[in-house]
UniProtKB/Swiss-Prot annotation:
Belongs to the VPS25 family. InterPro entries: ESCRT-II_cplx_Vps25-sub, ESCRT-II_cplx_Vps25-sub_N, WH-like_DNA-bd_sf, WH_DNA-bd_sf. It comes from the Eukaryota. This is Vacuolar protein-sorting-associated protein 25. Keywords: Cytoplasm, Endosome, Membrane, Protein transport, Transport. One of its GO terms (biological process) is protein transport to vacuole involved in ubiquitin-dependent protein catabolic process via the multivesicular body sorting pathway. It comes from Schizosaccharomyces pombe (strain 972 / ATCC 24843). Homodimer. Component of the endosomal sorting complex required for transport II (ESCRT-II).
């Protein structure tokens, strides 16, 4: 993966005290987080000590690691900008979704795929969608459901419950 040049600049891994510099640093980190998640097809991140060993927060070439407390500040800013969302509204907030594609973008991609596959009027299970359309196999069940709920609100699909009583598929109304 091609990393941004700032990733090799040691001060990038230290929270800057000057407000203007910190604002720029947060923006650079947000771009890096979105790029890293997109390249790794990761839509959620768990904030824990193991994360400190990942290439997201640790640059082994320059021996620098972004502290988790600073990472949390950056994530909070991403949440305010709708680039991320905590999976739980209550504390502790340890897991978040990263929107390197918005819910709407995911929905549009699914609709295009359904249209290209001639699926209008047919029924599709969540499993079938993620097995056949590899672009969305990185979405966890909850995030996929959020995307499909948006499509339902727009009148594109009708969610269907399986024998377990949980939503497990949908009928394509208009792709």
């Amino acid at each position: 993966m091609r990393v941004p040049s700032i990733y090799n600049f040691p001060p990038f891994f230290t929270r800057q005290l000057n407000d203007n510099t910190w604002h720029s640093q947060k923006a650079a980190w947000q771009m890096w987080i979105l790029l890293w998640c997109r390249e790794n097809r990761q839509t959620s991140i768990t904030i824990n000590p193991e994360l400190l060993e990942s290439s997201l927060l640790h640059n082994s070439t320059i021996h620098r690691t972004l502290p988790l407390s600073v990472f949390r500040e950056i994530v909070e800013d991403m949440v305010k900008q709708n680039l991320a969302e905590w999976t739980e509204k209550r504390n502790p907030k340890d897991v978040f979704w990263v929107y390197w594609r918005s819910i709407s973008e995911w929905g549009n991609m699914i609709l295009k795929w359904l249209s290209d596959m001639g699926r209008e009027g047919s029924i599709c299970t969540f499993y079938e969608l993620q097995e056949q359309y590899k672009e969305v196999d990185c979405l966890d069940e909850v995030l996929l459901h959020k995307v499909l709920e948006l499509l339902m609100k727009k009148g594109n699909i009708e969610l269907m419950k399986g024998s377990s009583g949980k939503y497990s598929g949908f009928k394509v109304l208009k792709a």
